A protein has these predicted regions:
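Soluble catalytic regions of membrane-associated enzymes that act on cell-envelope
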Residues: 1-185
Length: 185
């Protein structure tokens, strides 16, 4: 049986995406900011939601942890942030890898060859990731290195302490913008 002798290649070359050539001559390029603002808040707990149709919407129903099987086929409330990040940065839905895909940032990030940060670098962009929790949370620093970010800053790097549960968006954005200004090429 030939399948018993099959040896997978050390690295499977991707053919889906081709790196773009850097613009010549270098053009003034706009800054690109992508902000993942997830909701871990279930609106059904509000008294104002009692009897309101929008609060009973199928968008807030799912069949599992993180509601990842909802009608939008995306996380709707609570959980799955690292999976949303993986999907956005790689262009791959983690579910195509089966149950093991639920650990994509831990088990698959190191195998990603064509990612959004790497593509942006071929266009001449500097890539900086600002992580709103501890840099080692769910191995984020390593995953983001594999995704191709040149710089990765967790809340420790922004002097925001370690209590990310009480961190306000405004605090994070102020510190992040200050750090980005210092790091610009």
């Amino acid at each position: 049986d030939a399948s018993a002798k099959f040896q997978p290649p050390e690295q499977i070359p991707q053919t889906r995406f081709k790196p773009a050539a850097a613009p010549h001559p270098p053009a003034v390029m706009p800054d690109i900011f992508a902000v993942l603002e997830e909701s871990t808040f279930d609106p059904k707990i509000l008294q104002a939601c009692n009897g309101q149709a929008v609060c009973a919407s199928a968008l807030f129903k799912g069949s599992g942890s993180g509601r990842e099987a909802g009608p939008l086929i995306t996380h709707t409330t609570a959980g799955g942030t690292a999976l949303s990040e993986f999907t956005f940065l790689t262009g791959l839905d983690w579910r195509i890898f089966g149950p093991g895909g639920a650990l994509a940032p831990l088990s698959l990030a190191s195998h990603m060859q064509a990612t959004l940060p790497k593509h942006l670098q071929t266009l001449g962009y500097q890539t900086i990731a600002i992580y709103p929790v501890g840099r080692n949370f769910l191995n984020a620093r390593e995953a983001y290195r594999y995704y191709g970010f040149e710089h990765f800053l967790g809340i420790e790097d922004l002097d925001l302490g370690s209590d990310w549960h009480s961190l306000r968006d405004g605090q994070l954005f102020d510190k992040a913008l200050g750090a980005i200004d210092k790091m610009r090429d």
